């Protein structure tokens, strides 16, 4: 199982900002773009139940800031949904999370899902270039910094489900990790490490009939 681990010098541990020190809202940005986003993210949150981990050691989070760079502690990305395994679902085993701080947890998400919308599609598909003195794009953060093993994007308008897996160039291990597109037979992705699948499901959720992205067990959708 590939789980990104992040380490920091012990001398800095006590001086680093904690979850309580960092903003929990999306600074300077509007709220969720439509009704679909929170419903779809909530379905992912509810169905992410990896059988290899106790529920209290699984974080299934939606619309939560992820702080990823201790050198720039206010830089963050805010995935529509992400899952982490091997960490407490509570902050320091006791508190509901305001955000997810990589330099405290030292474990990257194992999977991130972004729900495409017209204003964010280019960045979420890695089609934008970072400008000088600006934070890295979502794609760069997920691929290069956090090295999130599975990155998924879902376009509700085209009913298009795409997934990428982070891989190192075996011929040249010194090269950085890169996302490679995965084949998705029947619009399904099986995550063997988690004994869990992710796929497009036709059904009624919260009173709405349609196509939804959800996790499923080996027994199927």
Regions found by a protein language model. Give the residues of each.
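C-terminal interaction segment
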Residues: 2-33, 47-50, 68-73, 89-111, ...
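Acidic-basic catalytic patches of nuclease active cores, encompassing PD-(D/E)XK
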Residues: 34-82
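Short, surface-exposed beta-edge/turn micro-motifs
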Residues: 79, 148-150
């Amino acid at each position: 199982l590939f789980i990104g681990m992040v380490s920091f010098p012990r001398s800095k541990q006590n001086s680093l900002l904690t979850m309580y020190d960092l903003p929990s809202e999306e600074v300077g940005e509007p709220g969720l773009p439509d009704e679909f986003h929170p419903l779809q993210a909530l379905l992912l949150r509810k169905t992410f139940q990896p059988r290899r981990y106790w529920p209290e050691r699984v974080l299934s989070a939606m619309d939560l800031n992820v702080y990823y760079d201790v050198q720039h502690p206010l830089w963050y990305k805010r995935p529509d949904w992400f899952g982490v395994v091997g960490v407490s679902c509570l902050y320091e085993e006791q508190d509901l999370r305001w955000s997810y701080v990589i330099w405290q947890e030292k474990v990257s998400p194992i999977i991130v899902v972004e729900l495409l919308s017209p204003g964010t599609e280019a960045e979420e598909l890695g089609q934008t270039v970072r400008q000088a003195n600006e934070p890295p794009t979502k794609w760069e953060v997920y691929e290069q910094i956090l090295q999130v093993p599975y990155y998924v994007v879902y376009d509700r308008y085209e009913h298009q489900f795409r997934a990428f897996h982070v891989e190192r160039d075996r011929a040249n291990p010194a090269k950085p990790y890169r996302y490679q597109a995965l084949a998705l037979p029947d619009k399904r992705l099986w995550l063997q490490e988690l004994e869990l699948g992710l796929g497009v499901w036709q059904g009624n959720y919260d009173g709405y009939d349609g196509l939804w992205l959800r996790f499923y067990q080996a027994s199927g959708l």
